[in-house]
Amino acid sequence: MLNEKEKSNDHNDWLKNSIKDEYLSYYDYSNFEITKTIGFGNFGKVLRANLKDTDTIFALKSFNIKFALKDIVNEIKLHRHVDIHQNILRFHGITWMESETFHRSYSLVLQYADSGTLETYLTEHFNELDWNDKHQLAFQLASAVECIHNLDIIHCDLQRI
């Protein structure tokens, strides 16, 4: 049976090999300009980040220190698994930042939703939407949830809208 250090090394090896084999894209953290915090959750926080010298904007999903590398690797695998659905944010890769204590802080590089969260969008635009628009949004949300459930994935952090 593997001890915790060996398990951590397995996950480090999986990340290194996934990047080397081009299963995952790696983005150097120094190539991002963080412009603002756009959300918080049980996992950590989400930052809006511009890729320097481009017009590309991403969302960087960071993780609280309580998350083990195995949890981050699992989330990456889940994102890769559901990257087939048009109403689920695209997963672009991974980045990390090294601290002075050589602790590596990982972030997922995700598609940036320029309208913000669905909750924010509905709060700001609900009265402007006709019933067809509202029906379409509900259908898209239900379709995305159905997709992940068909893959035996439970979201665990859906918010009340």
Feature map (PLM): residue ranges:
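Short beta-strand micro-motifs within the conserved protein kinase catalytic domain, predominantly
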Residues: R90-Y106
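Activation segment of protein kinase catalytic domains, centered on the conserved DFG
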Residues: E124-F139
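Protein kinase glycine-rich loop
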Residues: T35-V46
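Conserved short submotifs of the Hanks-type protein kinase catalytic core
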Residues: F102-T117
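Glycine-rich ATP phosphate-binding loop
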Residues: K45-N64
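Juxta-kinase regulatory segment immediately upstream of eukaryotic protein kinase catalytic domains
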Residues: M1-Y26
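Catalytic-loop of the protein kinase fold
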Residues: H149-I161
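The N-lobe alphaC helix and its flanking beta3-alphaC-beta4 segment of protein kinase-like domains
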Residues: N64-Q86
